[in-house]
Amino acid sequence: MLFNTIEFVIFFISILSIFIIFKNRKFHHYFLLVAGFLFFYWSNNYLITLLIFSILLDFYVGKEIFKAKTITRKKSLLILSLVGNLGLLGFFKYSDFAIAQFNILGNYINLTDSIPFLNLALPIGISFYTFQTISYTVDIYRGQLKPSNSLREFAIFVAFFPQIVAGPILRAKDFLPQLNEKMEKLKISKLRLITLEKTSFRIGVAMMALGFFKKMFFADNIAPMVNDIFAMPVGLESFT
């Protein structure tokens, strides 16, 4: 479900409307989490299990990295995060490429049988949430971030549907504090109630409209020509 489709627009407006009507912050947390999982399930069905795996892996690995006393253990845990996440990404994204190279090699050494392609569908957003969760564990490893104490909040960070299709990749240190931000003037937590500022809302709508315009009138019209060039780069130059 791309962000410039009517399905996404309807889904987004529905979520935003409920978000505005019910102003309890705890409700917002659970609602955003359910919306994110629903978005992934709608797009990928059973492949949502990969998202859940990444969430659980890096949430608990991040905690263990933070508690680790030796650099060796920290590195081992970070490697576990990298292997777990990049292994899944590589399997879905490059398995057929690896099989093709193996079959080519098999032809050179006269192997009679070739390995059939898996033809796996690439799970939506897997590149974004893979590197997003990796950045979380890397920041903890470097001492730039403390691990989240809430699995719910970490899951919201990873499954935040508005950016998972086309990015950008979120950083936990920028996103997680917003879930429990303070009202500076009143010095009270916004955990229970949230208000939607009209100015911020208008700016957000204007920026989204500008993004839709750029996508539909520029990117979508330029893409066919660019794709043709990338499909046959031999003999072409930068000024072609």
Locations of regions flagged by a protein language model:
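Membrane-embedded transmembrane alpha-helical bundles that form the catalytic cores
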Residues: 1-240
